[in-house]
Amino acid sequence: MNNKFIQQIKCWFTFLFIICSTFSAWGAYAQTAKVTLQMDNVRMEQVMNEIEKQTSYFFIVNKGVDINRTISINVADKPLGIALQAMVAGTKTEYKIYQQNIYLSVSSDKKAANNGSTKVSGVVRDTKGTPVVGASVVVKGTTIGTSSGLDGAFSLQVPAPAQTAELYVNFIGYDPVTVKIGTQTFFAITLKEAAEQIEDVVITALGIKRSEKALAYTVQQVKSEAVTTVKSANFVNSLAGKVAGAVINTSSSGVGGSAKVIMRGMKSIMQTSNVLYVIDGIPMHNFTSDGSMEFGSRGTTESIADMNPDDIESISVMTGAAAAALYGSDAANGAMLITTKKGKAGATQIQVSSNTEFMNPLRLPDFQTRYGTGRKGKASGSTIHSWGAPLNQAARYNYSPEDFLQTGHILTNSVTLSGGTEKNQIYFSTAAVNSKGLVPNNKYNRYNFTFRNTSNLLNDRLILDVSGSYIIQKDRNMINQGVYSNPLVSAYLFPRGDDFSLVKAFERWNPARKIYAQFWPQGEGGDLRMQNPYWIAYRNPRENSRKRYIFTGGITYKITDWMNVAGRIRIDNTNSLYTEKLYATSNPTLLENSKKGKYTETRGEERQTYGDVMLNISKTFKEKFALDAHIGASIKDNRFDELSVYGPIAGAPNIFNVVNLDKSQKKTPKTGWHEQTQSFFYSLELGWKSQLFVTTTGRNDWASQLANSPQKSFFYPSVGVSWLPSSTFNFPEKFNYLKIRASWASVANPFPRELTIATHPYDDTISGWDDKSNYPIGQLYPERTKTWELGFDARFLNGFTLTASWYRADTYNQTFNPNLSASSGYSDIYIQTGHVRNTGVEASLGYNHQWKNWNWNSQFTFSWNKNKIIELCKEWYNPITEETISMNRLQISKLGRAKFILKEGGSMGDLYSTTCLLYTSDAADDRISVD
């Protein structure tokens, strides 16, 4: 998708934003405009002039209205509607507000009295007592009607005989109400939100609303309260323990760091097993910064962490591949569907939220304090080890890593605004997250701004939904999981025989070099020695700044009552700047032996563009059969570019600027990638008597990763059946709902990018291009996951719900690099083999009951998953060496002495330690020390 097209889309969204803002202002201002009038014995015209001065409204007076009559009015900071009612009280004048005008006309009471009609009035409110503005009030069976005003009030003439007539009150988003008039002339009407009636409707793939009883797979609903009651900077962490079958692990990066969500076990050897995030039916590529190893220093962040939890209406969690098959390969590991809030018609509502959280470590590793600084039972004054001579009680400093950590806090403040008319609703929110971490000099700040406008046009046949978000994030020293740039390592390993208070003054003036130098007596280890943890925090700062903007637009056109066509588009761009400053006297390996420091500056850009169009059909035949069909196409285009400049400082020490770098050692690596997937999909559901449902879906992807491969695209189907015995048979009243379901799905996943064409990376060590490439070229096939699921859903004893599922997922044809010898001139050799199986059970038991004015809601979840490597590599033929290879063991990666090893019969994620343990007997007290 070229830049010109993207620019046109941006201009189009800007135009829609301005137009929708203008329309929404008419309705919103009418509900919020307030006036103050304290006028006695003045002409009505004078009151009208004062209202025009205090608001942006103008009066239009019809013939017969006496604006010269004397009135008195006394209102202070009241809505415009109340002031107008006070102005016309006791007169034969009535008013009506339309856009920016207030129309005054002669009341029709006198005429009504002559024809025998009756005037009735009332007020329309919601369940919270808030006036409902613009509610339709109609005399049933006639065309006589009106709308409720700014304060929810209404009045109209009911033709004779009024005693037998009925009022029909309706408003979008609420259940309609019918009341009989009888002899009553005033009515207080309460409208309930329609969600209370359609609670069995859930959001599924592509934002499609489906009846819960028709689903052949597990979809767990999570309300917004789950992520807003106790807020986390990354709302995903708030879902831990609330979704059966999902394991949520927080990263080591602290506040704002990424969260790893694994549903139903790890499946792929070399590719991600993380969940897909979908916002308002549109999938989002979750850009995640790479984690660090021994020498890394950059923490991990992700795109989903930018989201404001107060913007979330609900979350639907699909743990199985069948549930998310319409999203294709991205959803092979499950999907989390997020529905955001939109404006609600009625009086403008403003919500202010403030949340403060204090943080202290819940538990730290256990450390020994009996042995002092040194090794093998011998004292040493310049080592990081704590296995020296035994310490007597007086020589123990009782140091704990908690002495290095501080009490952290997270301050979250947000404001949301919602309102509008029945035809146009607006939503706006802003939020700020400000945090100080547990580690000194660790900070995280994020600011969110969101706008959304929904309009019903062309007699409600056309729905236009546009939104925009702008996010600013700044963080400092997000903790990485490495060794030499992680302050926690040296804080944990600080010798128990040394005084930690001495190293808190982490730098000393060096008169010879005329700079402040690192103070760290525990300097054993040469070039790989640890550093003072305070020096890392304050003199190895890592700062990241991100600016992200998102534009989303959707149009739905209603062709008939049972058919509509919808189109959506989303543009999501992020610009980032990352800097790392290593002061002089830092670890010489990290400084590349520079005596003056080192500086890194990295600029990155992430771009996502998504668009789809879909035809939706929902029709019932002969009151027995129901058809729900969806067919559509989509395009997804993701890009990432990053340019770095780094090197040792050549000029004045500790002056961090790219122009101060050593030109002979300065490096400017550039990385990036571009992926595009074009898709065609369908979903077909057939229902019989609302008790038996058969669903099938299909999707075909043309992924750019498959270019120059034998299989240019891949198709993945799913099929499911659900049956409601509680509707087929007469169940006892206390056991009122039972659904049995089964589903099967096959989901494909393309292999990693850049494996189908020869690639030659730039090698900084030789200042040229590497002449080696990977093997094979053009002979790779997609990975495939096949899933079975059986389960049931039950409701009983007036409030209990029970959901249980059994599943099995088998992943085949995995692509990985076994680090085989590539002596024939290839950089890497990739093989496709392997079989990983996940078998498990999910269950959730809930209870929800309402007692008049209070509610009890609780839920218990249970998950069990067995991950097993069935086959790793069996009789794979190596065309380079002409050997047949079989492997039942493969080392994927390592961190120090810890190794990630795959073994047949083992499971994904098994870690093995090869550390040698040295036991030294202490004859004095017969204790054993471990070195």
Indicate residue ranges for each PLM-predicted region.
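Short glycine/threonine-rich loop-to-helix capping motif typified by GTGT followed
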Residues: 708-713
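Active-site lining segments that contact anionic ligands and/or coordinate catalytic metals
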Residues: 258, 312, 333, 693, ...
